[in-house]
Design a protein with these regions (language model features):
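Signature of N-terminal electron-transfer/Fe-S-associated modules in redox systems
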Residues: 2-169
Length: 169
């Protein structure tokens, strides 16, 4: 079955725009299509559309969606009127591309204590949306966020011999 979805997309390009602007669109997608199909469609329709092709992380109607779930599931949850915006407005460089440079320092601290595998680094960046959930992350520029603490908890499980050093971070 097909779903017709009315979109309100909050777009922004740090190089050109002072403030975000809204683009409205209507799309028709199969309910079995994953959310990534919507982003691929928008990429083909919109000039210079920016999003992470490897990791879906977006706010739909003010709710964080960080998994590539089906359009049908999302329609059940959000209806057929979606407001799409970056999960990290202050760190957004272009549309849905988030500047992660500020996270290199906390990740380097962990690397100084124990090796970080490519799978562990992938986990770190999958937890990225959780770095922006608390008001602290909005007000303290050096605060790595709750995502970093979730990552540390996982690293402690995977590297118990360095647990005490990791807990000091």
């Amino acid at each position: 079955m097909q779903e017709q979805i009315q979109l309100e997309i909050l777009r922004f390009d740090i190089k050109k725009d002072y403030l975000p602007y809204t683009h409205k669109d209507i799309v028709i997608l199969e309910e079995t299509n994953p959310l990534s199909e919507l982003f691929a469609l928008l990429d083909s329709r919109l000039l210079h559309f920016g999003y992470n092709k490897h990791r879906i992380q977006v706010k739909i109607n003010d709710v964080l969606v960080h998994q590539d779930v089906s359009v049908g599931m999302l329609c059940e949850r959000f209806g057929r009127h979606w407001r799409l915006e970056s999960f990290a407005p202050k760190a957004t460089a272009h549309d849905f591309l988030v500047n992660t440079d500020f996270l290199s320092a906390p990740l380097a601290l962990v690397r100084n204590i124990c090796p970080v595998s490519s799978e562990e680094e992938e986990l770190f960046f999958n937890l990225l949306p959780f770095c922006f959930l608390s008001p602290l992350s909005q007000n303290l520029p050096d605060y790595a966020g709750e995502g970093f603490f979730l990552f540390l908890a996982e690293m402690i499980k995977m590297h118990p011999q360095q647990a005490s050093e990791l807990m000091r971070l």
